[in-house]
Amino acid sequence: MPRKRVIARREVLPDPKYGSVQLAKFITILMLSGKKSLAERIIYGALGRVSEKANQDPMDVLEKALENVRPLVEVKSRRVGGATYQVPVEVRPERRSTLAMRWLVEAARKRSEKSMDLRLAGELLDAHEGKGTAVKKREDTHRMAEANKAFAHYRW
């Protein structure tokens, strides 16, 4: 790893339909085996279904869903004197959004609806209402951090 200079982060181009950088990142996280056009079709289909069911702007629903799933704290393992402690650490804003998107996609993949756009739409609507598997994952993460608050002084 070079020590000389900080490497510039790659600029993410906004998605073609809604012009949102966040949605472009969501498409990339959903994508499997480099099939970006398929991921775009799934997301745009899911957002179409969300706008039908919720009678709201799909981008507003997506933003609220992400807000309800974003974790504030997480636990990281830290080895101290032969024992491994789960140390609660605050999550950086960039990682918050990435984790939220990743958890939404994971939760959607585990659902039982027939097609992926139906599953993703269902998970987005659930997260928008503050329920669903992705929101539960966030609550579990927060609970773990709260339970291990005593080890917060091991932060690095």
Swiss-Prot record:
Q: What does this protein do?
A: One of the primary rRNA binding proteins, it binds directly to 16S rRNA where it nucleates assembly of the head domain of the 30S subunit. Is located at the subunit interface close to the decoding center, probably blocks exit of the E-site tRNA.
Gene for this chain: rpsG
Cited InterPro entries: Ribosomal_uS7, Ribosomal_uS7_bac/org-type, Ribosomal_uS7_dom, Ribosomal_uS7_dom_sf
Keyword Ribonucleoprotein belongs to the record: yes
Q: Which GO terms describe its cellular component?
A: small ribosomal subunit
What domain of life is recorded for the organism? Bacteria
**This chain belongs to which protein, by name?**
Small ribosomal subunit protein uS7
Keywords per UniProt: Ribonucleoprotein, Ribosomal protein, RNA-binding, rRNA-binding, tRNA-binding
Record-level Gene Ontology MF annotations: rRNA binding; structural constituent of ribosome; tRNA binding
Assembly and interaction partners: Part of the 30S ribosomal subunit. Contacts proteins S9 and S11.
Q: Could you read off the lineage of the organism from its UniProt record?
A: Bacteria, Pseudomonadati, Pseudomonadota, Gammaproteobacteria, Chromatiales
